Amino acid sequence: MAQTYYKIGVQSTEVNSESIFFNPEVDSSDTVAVVSAGIVVVGTILTAFASFVNPGVVLISFGTLAPVLWPDPEEDPKKIWSQFMKHGEDLLNQTISTAVKEIALAHLNGFKDVLTYYERAFNDWKRNPSANTARLVSQRFENAHFNFVSNMPQLQLPTYDTLLLSCYTEAANLHLNLLHQGVQFADQWNADQPHSPMLKSSGTYYDELLVYIEKYINYCTKTYHKGLNHLKESEKITWDAYNTYRREMTLIVLDLVATFPFYDIRRFPRGVELELTREVYTSLDHLTRPPGLFTWLSDIELYTESVAEGDYLSGIRESKYYTGNQFFTMKNIYGNTNRLSKQLITLLPGEFMTHLSINRPFQTIAGINKLYSLIQKIVFTTFKNDNEYQKNFNVNNQNEPQETTNYPNDYGGSNSQKFKHNLSHFPLIIHKLEFAEYFHSIFALGWTHNSVNSQNLISESVSTQIPLVKAYEVTNNSVIRGPGFTGGDLIELRDKCSIKCKASSLKKYAISLFYAANNAIAVSIDVGDSGAGVLLQPTFSRKGNNNFTIQDLNYKDFQYHTLLVDIELPESEEIHIHLKREDDYEEGVILLIDKLEFKPIDENYTNEMNLEKAKKAVNVLFINATNALKMDVTDYHIDQVANLVECISDDLYAKEKIKFTPCIKFAKQLSQARNLLSDPNFNNLNAENSWTANTGVTIIEGDPLYKGRAIQLSAARDENFPTYLYQKIDESLLKPYTRYQLRGFVEGSQDLELDLVRYGATDIVMNVPGDLEILSYSAPINPCEEIETRLDTTCGALDRCKQSNYVNSAADVRPDQVNGDPHAFSFHIDTGTTDNNRNLGIWIIFKIATPDGYATFGNLELIELGPLSGEALAQVQRKEQKWGKNTTQKREEAAKLYAAAKQTINQLFADSQGTKLRFDTEFSNILSADKLVYKIRDVYSEVLSVIPGLNYDLFMELENRIQNAIDLYDARNTVTNGEFRNGLANWMASSNTEVRQIQAHPCWYSLGWNAQVAQSLNVKPDHGYVLRVTAKKEGIGNGYVTILDCANHIDTLTFSSCDSGFTTSSNELAAYVTKTLEIFPDTDQIRIEIGETRSTFYVESVDLIRMED
């Protein structure tokens, strides 16, 4: 009879009896051996990870795995590896050449030798730590590691890669286990042999471990899919062959690959509980299930019907439930359930079906050997609380020969429950053979791994990874098949998902998501009564279009995101966790979530995490293999890393702390060296080469958010009197066409203005919420108990060691406002050409100009980012050109005003050196010249009026000469305060007189005929004097200035309203006139009196000048 085969992926059209109703193949001894070995290795590793609670103990000794992979070391040490190769050949119907086999077996046996030698040396060192034993174990470890690195490629030859995949995966596991021990113990080996050069550290081996975890995961997964695709594309392939490859390579390869990430000892220093949620099947394509939430069997109803051959199993109704939702079951019906009788097989909570024995009669019809008939007996073996039970279904027909098939094959008869699988799916169809009146049972059995916990129980001692497919509710059809290395299917979160968990004890946990996304996606997470919103950053860039498949993803496309808040879970209570995607789902914008991780928080965990955080944080400060600081590592970040180092336990990790301290000090030195700011630590404000500040600025120390000093700006009186802090970076420190960046950290601010000034001002306003809650404390205080970015009500003081908001150990996110953290800021400014003579520099100005403003900030730094190019270069060139043109115009305008004012000022003096005023220079002349000086614009910065502007030098040159003229004027005037610039100081005045400002000039003003001011003066009787008065009289009556001496000699200058036509020199102020009078006092004292007879009298100045020889 012609043979008809399945074409994978296409619904079969011609179903031949031989292709479906065949006698199930009895597994070969090779298959039993290799699948058994694979299952045992995976079970051993899962158990080891879950119990790895002591960092000083080896995770898995080589002696534990050796009996599995080399079961007969004396008789045939290569036996199991040969069987792995034979199994690969059988699955893919291909052959490995003898030469390739021999080479591969030689390398695999070589792995055993180097691991054996290493483990002997390791045990000797453990028993007797010394320089000699440490040197030997280091050498043998490195030899073993080098052996794997050199020879693993021999197991991945392109022609034979799929056939050797099982061998490769087992060997990769041995290598990762070896590197895991290197990370654990290398630093201890080095400490025991301090004088040995060129030793690799634990950190070096950790970097290599991460590289090989990723490499092995990606290679094994892609090679598995390569073999699967080869079967799909084969012309003569049955579903059974295809499914056998999936099932057995899942048990040997994918299950083991799913454990590889957890060799990362620094992420999982105290072990982890894992679960494999994938489902493996026996038998037929159309009886397997598509991806869906993980389910549990609660009972099976078996229905019976009678035919000529006797009673038989005619239908099955399964009852299933989602994890944690056992009171809501789903029913699946297969076959005919409306028949003779039924039998219920019930599973109690915690009871699982682990084994089935199925009896079916068989006949030989039309040349078909052992054509199986209907099911008449099933023995279900269940497991609960380490006890096995049997539950039977039996129709008691013995009319035909019977054959019993066991499911699943126990692959070596292991009695350990940790290596078993649980029945998850039992679909059935009844088929009638067309060429004979004969009915046959066709069924499939789905099995899930026993590592899956039915309660989502969270461990109190190690990390717990709970696959999200164990949720009880998910919307929008969002369960998809996993990529192969996750141990099961994934949730594509399109809307929301809910899962139940239960903690084994009252404890705090750090909760993380293991996810992949191709865009930044906001997700809200509710854990019991606690809630948090997170922004998951993209982990890969490929879009989810029609060409995208989950197999396109690599291991590094998945990342962890840890919630910033540790959450306390109650003991033995169900906790509902709800995840909701906050954006509107868009086709192609993918968010895949694999697992939730719960890490218990206790003192040991905290100490270990402090050490791991410090290690990671210190390692990423520097550019690889150099002593250069990474550009995006800020000064604040370094301080926070220093805090992490300080918080390493002295009792437990003194060596590590001593090792990291010089590194962090060196990083701080590099940060200070590249910082162009003077006095960035605010050691001495208003000193030379420091910051300039006014009285509203305070230096603060002891703020728990800052390791060093910070600065505080208080509110301004008004916008004309801001609180300010500024500094100029000298031109000599700058490079042409270069970008510089100002960075810092703001604790909180309101109306804080920042201006970066070179070619005009870059005005920035920072309103930063003061949301970093700080508990009060009293000194002295442990530095590790100073700060917590959130309020911790369980502790009497803040714990700086728990501070994680602003310390990113990966240092891969720039702390600026654009990326979402308002407390950290970074802004850039570009230079064009540089000119040390012009010394344009960069001005950095902070100010508060509002009565409600305030700010506290620190860790300021200005660093060089690098040379400009492209659009940035063109932009700064345009900006500099525009600024230069505008500046030239302003300078030209100022030069004209300068020339006019200078000419006027020159006329004030009697000589070019400015040592003497002209005799006829009046104070009003000086004021008029000063007005011309003040017409010059851009004297001070537009940003802050105390900072020199473009024309400051011109202005100050003229203003200094004006002040010189005033000083000379005051020096020659015998009358003190004769211009009333200081009001009525030095004058004896009646109550009805005052000084008023007339057109910005101070003038004495009388309020009545009896108003009077007077001043007594000392003079030299042998000299003549000139009395010069500038005044104005309004209305009727006269104003007078009288001078008299002790000999009653009286001289008077009289002013009237008719003086405007007087021929004396006129003043700029309307109607003011200047009159003079020569006097020759006969005594050494005189008195000047000013008054009027009626109406109003104004006096601008009174001068008494001694005559020159």
Curated annotation (Swiss-Prot):
Pfam families: Cry1Ac_D5 (PF17997), Cry1Ac_dom-VII (PF21463), Endotoxin_C (PF03944), Endotoxin_M (PF00555), Endotoxin_N (PF03945)
GO term, biological process aspect, one: symbiont-mediated killing of host cell
Keywords: Sporulation, Toxin, Virulence
Keyword hit for Chloroplast: no
GO molecular function: signaling receptor binding; toxin activity
Other remarks in the entry: Toxic segment of the protein is located in the N-terminus.
Entry function: Promotes colloidosmotic lysis by binding to the midgut epithelial cells of insects.
Family per similarity comment: Belongs to the delta endotoxin family.
Protein name: Pesticidal crystal protein Cry28Aa
Name of the gene: cry28Aa
